[in-house]
């Protein structure tokens, strides 16, 4: 096996620490071609679709990609950001803003850490971002997937790709992985503050008259639960802790699961039918929040804010409120910093004094080092 070339080593250079934020991914543009390329990579991952390749790939290439690429492109087009200060895929824009804000906060508190974001599918890829970190001299890397609840379909495949990339390196960095943070107090507090801030601006639901808060998480096939994936349990725990933090009674909020794909049974209750049923019974107001998505994306902005609202109102519902994800809100950035710092303990987070670095270089050269 041939390993990728290493950057020239320089004695006297301070080793750097990096945090790699990983999210699912996004197409490069809201076009059928770009969306098709993204979906091909995403749906070809055996962690995502656990069907024998011989049966799945012909269906994917022959039916699903030709049909879904154009339809999905229209959905991406409906949410694509085109503002002067925010242009592109919402998920990528907000992920980059999170990375910049987290690095800024850490630096303000004396922690000299490089923060970068990567996508499991699409760009910027995990491989390209890790290569950039290597070129910057990052010898310690904390991988922090933006999946609060662990799942083999998300967190595990992000780790798989990190390992695959490092398998091509001769000089590998020290590595730490954050498996989940579904019940971390800072995460729950940031969620609570996001919902409370929305209610402070737009008024609270009247739970006494039957209004409801829906906590919608991304769904996965029920089979994964039966095979030992902890995702379902972690979603329920997040929902319970958030409900308690908001001071709600169990009947005032409900955990649901969205984004079902295919005909197999997924985790239930499903979000869309739940919204339709609430509309049918004449619910006055429904608020929907997606705790499992730290950044807004097509699943929140289009599937919930647009399609979900239509489901609810067509069925007879009246007042629909979509509560945006945390994105780069200050409480969430502070929570990210707290989570990261717990996992960074023991690593050097400050650059040694230049005199110390020069002394190291001099000692190495005295022993025959070239640089």
Curated annotation (Swiss-Prot):
Database matches in InterPro entries: Ferrochelatase, Ferrochelatase_AS, Ferrochelatase_C, Ferrochelatase_N
Record keyword Lyase present: yes
SUPFAM superfamilies given in the database record: Chelatase
GO cellular component: cytoplasm
Main function: Catalyzes the ferrous insertion into protoporphyrin IX.
PANTHER family membership: FERROCHELATASE, FERROCHELATASE, MITOCHONDRIAL
Name listed for the protein in its UniProt record: Ferrochelatase
């Amino acid at each position: 096996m041939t390993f990728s070339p290493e950057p020239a080593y320089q004695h006297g250079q301070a080793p750097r620490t990096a945090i790699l934020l990983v999210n699912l991914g996004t197409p490069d543009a809201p076009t059928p071609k770009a969306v098709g390329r993204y979906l091909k990579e995403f749906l070809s991952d055996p962690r995502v679709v656990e069907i024998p390749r011989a049966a799945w790939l012909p269906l994917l290439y022959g039916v699903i990609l030709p049909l879904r690429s154009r339809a999905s492109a229209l959905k991406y087009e409906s949410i694509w950001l085109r503002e002067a200060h925010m242009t592109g895929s919402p998920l990528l824009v907000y992920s980059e803003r999170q990375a910049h804000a987290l690095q800024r906060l850490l630096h303000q508190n004396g922690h000299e850490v490089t923060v970068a974001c990567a996508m499991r599918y699409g760009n910027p890829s995990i491989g390209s971002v890790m290569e950039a970190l290597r070129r910057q001299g990052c010898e310690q890397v904390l991988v922090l997937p933006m999946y609060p609840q662990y799942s083999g379909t998300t967190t595990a495949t992000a780790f798989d790709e990190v390992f695959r990339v490092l398998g091509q390196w001769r000089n590998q960095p020290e590595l730490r992985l954050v498996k989940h943070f579904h019940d971390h107090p800072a995460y729950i507090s940031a969620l609570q503050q996001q919902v409370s801030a929305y209610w402070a601006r737009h008024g609270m639901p009247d739970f006494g008259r039957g209004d409801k808060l829906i906590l919608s998480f991304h769904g996965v096939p029920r089979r994964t639960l039966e095979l030992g994936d902890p995702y379902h349990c972690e979603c329920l725990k997040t929902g319970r802790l958030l409900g308690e933090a908001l001071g709600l009674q169990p009947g005032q909020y409900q955990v649901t699961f969205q984004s079902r794909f295919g005909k197999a049974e997924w985790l239930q209750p499903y979000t869309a039918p739940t919204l339709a049923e609430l509309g049918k019974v004449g619910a006055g107001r429904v608020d929907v929040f997606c705790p499992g998505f730290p950044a807004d994306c097509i699943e929140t902005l289009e599937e919930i804010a647009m399609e979900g609202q239509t489901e609810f109102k067509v069925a007879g519902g009246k007042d629909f409120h979509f509560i945006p994800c945390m994105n780069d809100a200050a409480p969430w950035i502070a929570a990210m910093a707290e989570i990261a710092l717990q996992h960074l303990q023991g690593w050097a987070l400050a650059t040694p004094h230049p005199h110390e670095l020069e002394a190291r270089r001099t000692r190495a050269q005295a022993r025959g080092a070239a640089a």
